[in-house]
Swiss-Prot record:
Protein name: Protein-glutamate methylesterase/protein-glutamine glutaminase 3
SMART domains the record matches: REC
Entry-linked SUPFAM superfamilies: CheY-like, Methylesterase CheB, C-terminal domain
Subcellular location as annotated: Cytoplasm
PTM comment, free text: Phosphorylated by CheA. Phosphorylation of the N-terminal regulatory domain activates the methylesterase activity.
Organismal lineage: Bacteria, Pseudomonadati, Pseudomonadota, Betaproteobacteria, Neisseriales
CheB-type methylesterase domain sequence ranges: 160-353
Keyword terms, alphabetized: Chemotaxis, Cytoplasm, Hydrolase, Phosphoprotein
Keyword Hydrolase: yes
Protein origin, superkingdom: Bacteria
Amino acid sequence: MSAGTGRRIRVVVVDDSALVRSLLTAIVNEAPDMEVVATASDPIIAREKIRETSPDVVTLDVEMPRMDGLEFLRRLMRLRPTPVLMISSLTDAGSETTLAALELGAVDFIHKPADDIARHMQEYAEEIREKLRVTAEARLRQPNRFRQPPPARKTGPGAPLRKNALVFVGASTGGTEAIKDFLMGMPADGPPILIVQHMPEHFTFTFAERLNKLCPMRVKEAEDGEAALAGVAYIAPGHSHMRVAPAGGGGFRIALDQEEPVNRHRPAVDPLFDSAARHLGKNAIGVILTGMGKDGAEGLLRMRHAGAVTFGQDEASCVVYGMPREAFRIGAVAHVLPLNRLAEKVVECLQSQAERAIT
């Protein structure tokens, strides 16, 4: 049931494939707390169905006849803001379009393969239902609210940054835009930033490329064994856990592995934060952003116990206040801040630590 109303979550399914509409309808209607109230084969029909049924969440395919899915999403968010779960193909083009949809206001996405869609969707039926529940309760991002990062900061001679620190970031639902806003506020010459965003394999490379075009720092998908360098933000690949490990000369390197999922995710945030606590202690800064579930909370607590400064995104600016809530609940978060102030405070922390080191 919808947490706010106690009634079933009302879903409208929009997809040009009759098979996908049928599969999603069956998956939704198998759950006692949700129901499909309408389906549509294209955005023109969907517009009328949404107006008639006032759904809690819409599933939306990107590639549809009569109107591009992104254009429909753009209009929907402007005229009748509604939580949207995107349906995306696992291709480079699909990942680029999905990231554009998240930027336009979609809450999350599920991916469908090119072959054997029926078996794949049945295997992930419970994950689809869980994403629908989270999407229905998500806080929609408002235009120009919590979205305007501070201007890119250049550190001058009077504001040195601590050089031996590393910054670690974890996020899930809503995280693609939150990470972008955070990195937009970090200076080009900042310390290495290691980031885990729950995302499939084909999407993380595209995500890193997209951020690299927008942010002051260089942003790239992480590679196993490479040095963690200042001025670079590293995105964990969608198929691997990412950890930090000591390297020669007092530096650090990135270690990737394909061990079992943690908290149902690979990459997961906890392995990254655990490695930061183990190898960096007080030389680490941890940041936990919007996302459902508990991944990262225990690792952030271990970072704090090891001496790291820890930050959590506040409830008001989160799309889904799950991971930061759990981290705050167990005492892992030292500083709670809105998204548009997190980068500023992390930079201030790095500057104050540098000043203390000098004196």
